[in-house]
Structures are given as C-alpha cells and as structure tokens.
Amino acid sequence: MLRKLVTGALAAALLLSGQSNAQNACQQTQQLSGGRTINNKNETGNGNGNYKYEIWRDGNGGSLTLYPKDAAFKASWNNSGDFLGRVGLTFNKPAATNLGGDLIANYNYKKSGSDGGTYSYIGIYGWMDNPQIEYYVVDDWMHNRGAPGGSYMGSQKGTITVDGGTYKVWSGQRTGASKWGTSTFTQIFSIRTSPRQCGSINVSEHFRQWQKLGLRLGGLMEAQLLAESGGGSGYVDFTYATITIGGSSSNASAPSNNNNNNNNNNDNNGNWNNWNNNNNNNNNNNNNNNNNNNNQGGGNCAAIWGQCGGSGYNGPKCCKQGSCKQINQWYSQCQ
C-alpha cells in the first residue's frame, strides 16, 4: 500500500502478554468510548503506551478515534478514495522471525458500510526492509464479493493453516510509491478463506509459513492492525485490540504449494476483476500483457474493471470496453 506518512520509529519496549487466546478476544465486546479523534487529515503519531497510529485518506472525509485502551480504535470513512486507519507497533528492523517471542495480534471489532465496490482489508499490515516488502494478513473485508485474490496480487504461492484458519498466500513485485519514495518491492498477502471479526493472529507463524513457501523476508519495521477501504462509506470499530510479543506459537500445518495456473487468475467466478485496485497494481513478472500499448481498438488493452493507468503503472493504458477513468493518482480503471 502506498504510504506517505509512515514513520519507522522503534518501539521503546516490546509488550509482553499471554493474551493470545482467540476465545478471550471474542469475549471482549464492551463498547469503548472517550479518547481522541483525528478528523479529515493525514497524520501519524503516538497512541497508548508503545503503540503508533496513522490515518491516511486520499480526499474527502475520514476520521480515526484512538480509544484510551491498548491499540483499540475506530476508523470511519466517507467517499474518501483510499482510506486507512491503523494502530500497532514499530520496530528497528530485527529479523522478522527473531523477535524474542511470537508476535500476536488479538482483536474484536464491529463493522458497517461498504468499500464502494473497489477493495478493502481488515487485518495486519506492515513493511520490512532489506529486501523491501509490503505485507498483509487479511482476516476480513467490507464487501460481499468473496475473498480477495487474483493476478493483481502476483501469483498464488500456496495455502497455509494458522490459528485454525486456512489462508491463501499470494506474492508479486510492484514498482511505485513506497516508504522509500518510488521503488520496486515485494508484496506478500495471507488471505483468510473464511472471514472473521474476532480472534488472534499469530503474525510470526505467518512469517514462518511464508519462509517455508520459499518467500524471502527482511527486517521488520512495523506490525499494525489495519482498516482500509478504497471507497464507499463505513466504519470498523475495534472494541478490543492488542499486539504483543511473547505469546506461544499456534499449531500450524505445513504449507501446501500451489502450482495450478488457474489460481493465478480470478478465483471468485469473475467477481474480482473490479478489485484490481490502486494499492495492489502489481507489475507482475508473470503478466505478459503489461506494456504501454495505447491502441484504443483493443489488442493488449485492459478488460472492463481492469487497471489502465496510475503513478508507477507500466501496463495497458487503453480499455477493451468502456473508458479509462482516473480513481486517484495511483490508479485508473476501465469502467
């Protein structure tokens, strides 16, 4: 995801806790109140304890309420284009799988609204360095189009089982805006096949499973609970949220490699072409159609709902159907 306001500050101390039980998180339903609200601006800063926060919006309305308890927050948006709210920990680039204990996120939230038919993520998000990696663990989303997935995420590397759930793992290369300006970096996604609104994410176990699939990791810069939407109006309200180090590792099955070419395409009966969004326009090395053909008659032009432009994008810039509409500076779509 494109982030202009992210800091790489080191957490002053790593939090230790044994609260890694999903059942406990799902029992934390009391509505929170109070705290501080940031309205209609892009900002990063310090939250409770060692937690850091960020709100980022690409126009129009959005707010982030920081509750006076742990990493709990409420993110709200109103036709704000790309919007995100996130709270979590930052690190000084230790090896992702050598943190002195497992990195565990516990959460419970309510949600309402939609992503405007584009894209949305709820889960864990962060960056690594050397190599540059943007990563997601997605447990839920704001739409009813099925689990995210498709060639815009790169290629499917396999499936893993973590915290009692099955995740499809995708990875690809992207060139565009990043924490380092404009650069080429790797994206890694764990997409849960059955969404949930409470539980525990053993982030460290995802890291280990990614390595078993042959993915190279870097030094950890951040791990934060995320609510992101590419449009529409709605909110995600975390009534309980902690990110700790020191929990025990969850039981995880060995990853299953996936070399089926069909999995590199839309795996939701065609419903996911319109999820090819501004944050995940991978310049995928497996996509031979990524060229600068401007032939408006078709040929290598993008299909309906496909990407046709944006900062850092090197693919087709014409549409087989409809016309190319700019969504924001990073993403234009055939509509």
Curated annotation (Swiss-Prot):
<feature type="glycosylation site" description="N-linked (GlcNAc...) asparagine">
    <location>
        <position position="42"/>
    </location>
</feature>
<feature type="active site" description="Proton donor">
    <location>
        <position position="228"/>
    </location>
</feature>
<feature type="active site" description="Nucleophile">
    <location>
        <position position="134"/>
    </location>
</feature>
<feature type="compositionally biased region" description="Low complexity">
    <location>
        <begin position="257"/>
        <end position="291"/>
    </location>
</feature>
<dbReference type="InterPro" id="IPR033123">
    <property type="entry name" value="GH11_dom"/>
</dbReference>
<dbReference type="GO" id="GO:0030248">
    <property type="term" value="F:cellulose binding"/>
</dbReference>
<keyword id="KW-0325">Glycoprotein</keyword>
<feature type="domain" description="GH11">
    <location>
        <begin position="39"/>
        <end position="241"/>
    </location>
</feature>
<dbReference type="InterPro" id="IPR018208">
    <property type="entry name" value="GH11_AS_1"/>
</dbReference>
<dbReference type="GO" id="GO:0045493">
    <property type="term" value="P:xylan catabolic process"/>
</dbReference>
<dbReference type="GO" id="GO:0031176">
    <property type="term" value="F:endo-1,4-beta-xylanase activity"/>
</dbReference>
<comment type="function">
    <text>Endo-1,4-beta-xylanase involved in the hydrolysis of xylan, a major structural heterogeneous polysaccharide found in plant biomass representing the second most abundant polysaccharide in the biosphere, after cellulose.</text>
</comment>
<feature type="region of interest" description="Disordered">
    <location>
        <begin position="251"/>
        <end position="291"/>
    </location>
</feature>
<dbReference type="InterPro" id="IPR035971">
    <property type="entry name" value="CBD_sf"/>
</dbReference>
<comment type="pathway">
    <text>Glycan degradation; xylan degradation.</text>
</comment>
<feature type="glycosylation site" description="N-linked (GlcNAc...) asparagine">
    <location>
        <position position="78"/>
    </location>
</feature>
<dbReference type="InterPro" id="IPR001137">
    <property type="entry name" value="Glyco_hydro_11"/>
</dbReference>
<feature type="domain" description="CBM1">
    <location>
        <begin position="300"/>
        <end position="335"/>
    </location>
</feature>
<dbReference type="GO" id="GO:0005576">
    <property type="term" value="C:extracellular region"/>
</dbReference>
<keyword id="KW-0732">Signal</keyword>
<keyword id="KW-0378">Hydrolase</keyword>
<keyword id="KW-0119">Carbohydrate metabolism</keyword>
<dbReference type="Pfam" id="PF00734">
    <property type="entry name" value="CBM_1"/>
</dbReference>
<feature type="glycosylation site" description="N-linked (GlcNAc...) asparagine">
    <location>
        <position position="202"/>
    </location>
</feature>
<keyword id="KW-0326">Glycosidase</keyword>
<feature type="signal peptide">
    <location>
        <begin position="1"/>
        <end position="22"/>
    </location>
</feature>
<dbReference type="InterPro" id="IPR013319">
    <property type="entry name" value="GH11/12"/>
</dbReference>
<dbReference type="InterPro" id="IPR000254">
    <property type="entry name" value="Cellulose-bd_dom_fun"/>
</dbReference>
<dbReference type="Pfam" id="PF00457">
    <property type="entry name" value="Glyco_hydro_11"/>
</dbReference>
<keyword id="KW-0858">Xylan degradation</keyword>
<dbReference type="InterPro" id="IPR013320">
    <property type="entry name" value="ConA-like_dom_sf"/>
</dbReference>
<feature type="glycosylation site" description="N-linked (GlcNAc...) asparagine">
    <location>
        <position position="251"/>
    </location>
</feature>
<protein>
    <recommendedName>
        <fullName>Endo-1,4-beta-xylanase S20</fullName>
        <ecNumber>3.2.1.8</ecNumber>
    </recommendedName>
</protein>
<keyword id="KW-0624">Polysaccharide degradation</keyword>
<keyword id="KW-0964">Secreted</keyword>
<comment type="similarity">
    <text>Belongs to the glycosyl hydrolase 11 (cellulase G) family.</text>
</comment>
